[in-house]
A protein has these predicted regions:
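Histidine-centered metal-chelating micro-motifs
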Residues: 56-58, 76, 93, 97-106
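Bacterial N-terminal signal peptides that target proteins for export
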Residues: 1-11
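A short glycine-rich, His/Asp/Glu-containing loop-to-beta-strand
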Residues: 27-59, 118
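Short acidic-glycine-tyrosine-enriched beta hairpin
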Residues: 36-41, 51-52, 81-98
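Short, conserved beta-strand element in jelly-roll/cupin
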Residues: 65-77
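Sec/Tat signal peptide C-region and signal peptidase I cleavage site
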Residues: 21-25
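Bacterial N-terminal signal peptides
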Residues: 9-20
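Ligand-binding loop in jelly-roll beta-barrel domains
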Residues: 84, 99-125
Length: 133
């Protein structure tokens, strides 16, 4: 009777995969936007990114200079080709216009995290673009 037992375990594994809860997404709120007259074609944006416990970003890029400041909690950040870093409240992080952000997630599964990001980007360009790996 080992065969029915095997079927049960295969069925259970398939059921678990189908009902797995997807990773929580971060919430992005725009705080401020301004045209930069001294930099033709550029604008400044300030956003707040709130990460619920366990939340993570999709792989993306900004096509902008992004200056990140951690307000609350701990965030794990990694740019393509660089090691991951864990940042806590009061620490900063920089992403350049050609960087691909491969990891951006809340380091905690129980506590929220928040960052504020200042972007210097092309006027009218999206704040971020998902990247396929």
């Amino acid at each position: 009777m080992k065969i029915p037992n095997l079927y049960f375990h295969v069925y259970l594994a398939a059921l678990l995969m189908l009902t797995a809860v997807p990773a929580k997404a971060a919430d992005v709120k725009e705080l401020f936007a301004i045209d930069l007259a001294d930099y033709p074609g550029k604008e400044g944006r300030m956003i707040e990114v709130s990460y619920p416990p366990g939340a993570q970003d999709v792989v993306h890029r900004h096509d902008a200079h992004a200056f990140v400041y951690v307000l609350e909690g701990q965030i794990i950040m990694q740019l393509k080709g660089q090691p991951a870093v864990t940042l806590k409240a009061g620490q900063t992080f920089y992403e350049g216009p050609t960087d691909v952000h491969v990891v951006g997630r809340n380091a905690s599964n129980t506590e929220p995290a928040r960052v504020v990001v200042v972007l210097l980007k092309g006027k009218g360009a999206p704040i971020f673009k998902p990247v396929k790996e």
